Amino acid sequence: EIGVRLVGSEMCIRDRVMSEGSNAKETVAILGGTGDLGTGLAIRWSKAGHKIVIGSRTLEKAQAAVAALHEISPETPAEAMENFDAAKAGEIVVLTVPAEHQESTLSSVKENLTGKILIDVTVPLVPPKVGTVQLPPEGSAGKRAQELLGEEVMVVSAFQNIAAHLLKEDIQIECDVLVTGNKKAARQRVIEMIESAGMVGWHAGPIDNAAAAEALTSILIQINRSGIVSHSGIKIIGQEH
């Protein structure tokens, strides 16, 4: 049997730090790395041995993002580039821009993504009703990215249900990550990266299933609004084989 357990801040975080990696790994380019999610992933993956590149629409914005990152985590090395150059430099590329900029950003860097894994964290929230599920006509933001980029890019959707600002803290996050994508090997590589960042990832099937993870975000927002828990997330439970 497999189930889903809701977790909140009082049970989701333990007072222990994640282990740091020592071996050099792929260069990770984070496009739109100015928010909590991009910053938190940069910190955690740098500790795990990845070289980090922060991309933005302009070099100045990228440099400002790196400066802000260093204020939070001075020991995290990161290079600033425009999105186009960052996508070229990254062996694995992560898209963390707001949903309204997803398509334009991907279109501008598409030629530099061929043969690579693109981790798409987009959640298609539509203000002001962010607590209501409003998926795009394509079915999900993840599927929209895959259709836009074509099969030569391995789109993997993940991180939609993580309380992003917690990633910047030096703590273990017990909330799980649902990972969808059409290539199992690409999903597995992303799951390994999730584990290196101190979380647990699960194979959740093809990119069509990204709709479920994206929709869950609005449900978690409603649960947070209840005041019973904060930073709610999910935990996959079941009997191990």
Question: Which positions does each model-derived feature cover?
Answer:
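Hydrophobic Val/Ile/Leu positions in short beta-strands of Rossmann-like dinucleotide-binding domains
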Residues: I13, I30-L31, V179
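Active-site-lining helix/loop region of Rossmann-like oxidoreductase modules
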Residues: C175-H241
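Rossmann-fold NAD(P)-binding glycine/threonine-rich loop
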Residues: T122-H165, E169
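Single conserved hydrophobic/aromatic residue that forms the stacking wall/gate
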Residues: E1-D15
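NAD(P)+-binding Rossmann beta1-loop-alpha1 motif at the extreme N-terminus of oxidoreductases
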Residues: V17-A68
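Rossmann-like NAD(P)-binding element
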Residues: S73, P77, M81-I117, P124-K129
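Rossmann-fold NAD(P)-dependent oxidoreductase module
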Residues: G40, R44, L148, M193
